[in-house]
């Protein structure tokens, strides 16, 4: 036979292990520095990752993950505990605790909240009304959709995402929305108040995010939206294997 024997798996040398450790320490220091800078300089998301008001944006690392699923609306959402989220890049590890998020609604609500928050210093409260949110999402203006919007905001807030990658290092327990509450509920002055997690903003830093035209994006079906997330987050996308795409959608259909 022409095939050579399989090489023995390489053990990491002491030097390589030390190099890994140094790299980890550097990553942690850089992350700490970025977060301290955000605080000290009162930076906004827009300072780190600008996008136009007719656009919305998303960190590439989340665009390529199965964080927002495309499962059937009739299928009840799963409650997930330290659930490993599929990611296109093997280098990225994401675990998720919370109620399953869907591309159909949660993804859009989150992107719109980032839009509202983008010009405020990270970590300061941002207010908007359910009327504004539903209008910007292209949703009907009625109580049912206000309730739907509130459910999405609550789900997004009740999340714990652990993230690690070679580029960023480790993020411990990031929430997609750091704080959410409804002020003056039931009154004419009622509004939502949210804060964005500074750890979340780190995912955007260094130009690692994608921008897209909102009017077109929000009209896409959930599956088309996830396909778009993949392609928009790669400058030169690899052809996408169907199985990889299925996993990226968090789909549980066998086909």
Where is each model-derived feature located?
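Charged, alpha-helix-forming regions
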Residues: 1-255
């Amino acid at each position: 036979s022409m095939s050579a024997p399989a090489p023995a798996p390489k053990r990491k040398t002491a030097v390589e292990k030390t190099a890994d450790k140094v790299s980890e320490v550097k990553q942690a220091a850089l992350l700490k520095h970025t977060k301290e800078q955000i605080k000290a300089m009162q930076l906004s998301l827009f300072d780190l990752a600008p996008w136009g008001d007719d656009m919305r944006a998303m960190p590439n690392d989340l665009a390529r993950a199965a964080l927002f699923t495309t499962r059937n609306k009739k299928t009840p959402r799963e409650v997930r505990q330290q659930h490993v989220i599929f990611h296109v890049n093997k280098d990225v590890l994401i675990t998720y605790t919370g109620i399953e998020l869907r591309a159909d609604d949660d993804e859009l609500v989150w992107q719109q909240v980032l839009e509202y928050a983008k010009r405020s210093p990270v970590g300061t409260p941002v207010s908007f009304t359910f009327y504004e949110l539903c209008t910007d999402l292209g949703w009907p203006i009625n109580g049912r959709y206000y309730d739907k919007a509130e459910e999405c905001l609550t789900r997004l807030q009740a999340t714990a995402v652990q993230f690690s990658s070679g580029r960023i290092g480790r993020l411990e327990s990031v929430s997609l929305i750091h704080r959410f509450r409804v002020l003056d509920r039931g009154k004419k002055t009622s509004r939502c108040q949210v804060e964005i997690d500074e750890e979340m903003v780190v995912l955007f830093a260094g130009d690692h995010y994608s921008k897209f035209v909102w009017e077109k994006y929000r009209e896409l079906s959930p599956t088309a939206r996830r396909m778009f997330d993949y392609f928009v987050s790669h400058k030169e996308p690899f052809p996408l294997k169907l199985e990889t795409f299925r996993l990226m959608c968090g789909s549980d259909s066998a086909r």
